[in-house]
Amino acid sequence: MNLHYGLHPATVVALEGDPESRQRIKVRLDWLAATDGGDPPEAWAVIVTPYADADQGFQMLPEVDSTVVVGFLAGHTDHPYVIGSVWNGEADAPERFTDANDKRVIQTRSGSRLEFDDTPGAVAVRISTPGGHEITMDDAGTNIEIAASSGARIELTAAGGVTIEAASTVDVTAAMVTVDAPMSTFNGVVTCDTLIAKGGGVISPMYTPGAGNVW
């Protein structure tokens, strides 16, 4: 029996159908010529991952037809282990390589993306979808921004505290809602269809709608 040590390229053939239900994937060993002159041999390979345990772990499988790197247990080709994937020149990385190496990226086939940006002075974490939705946590601006593809945007910037709590319901439906205040306090029940007070305003411990109904 010929033993094969070291690392070797392989092509992913299938992610399903492991006859032993061991969460292995099928790979084709293109570099290993079949003894009968036929197609290159295929084998079920164990995936090496940073974390694997019962009903938990790090699960990111390579695509069918992608190139992976395999090693063999004690050199036996019938016991391959997939130790990683490679960009083979036909498939590009999601981000261009730079010597500064400021960005770490996880990007899916559709373009959903998690980006860690270590650019000096502009450190940020971004989560985005191919449809244009994005969440940005920006250390440079000390803010958190949620942006929808429609152009809607929520931005949180606070030197103090921002707290929103709801045991049941918080609803805001607007044609226009503007609160710009050194102080706004609401306790108890506030119900109003129309209340317009400018200039002197309304100051009273008791108020009900209607002319003169201020005590």
Region spans (language model):
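Right-handed beta-helix
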Residues: 4, 9, 19, 59-66, ...
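Generic structural motif
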Residues: 10-14
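Short aromatic-glycine-enriched beta-strand elements
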Residues: 19-28
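A structural micro-motif recognizing beta-strand termini
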Residues: 28-30, 50, 109-110
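Short, small-residue-rich loop/turn micro-motifs
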Residues: 29-33, 190
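Short, basic/aromatic beta-hairpin or loop at an interaction surface
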Residues: 35-49
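Short alpha-helix capping/helix-loop boundary micro-motifs
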Residues: 51-58
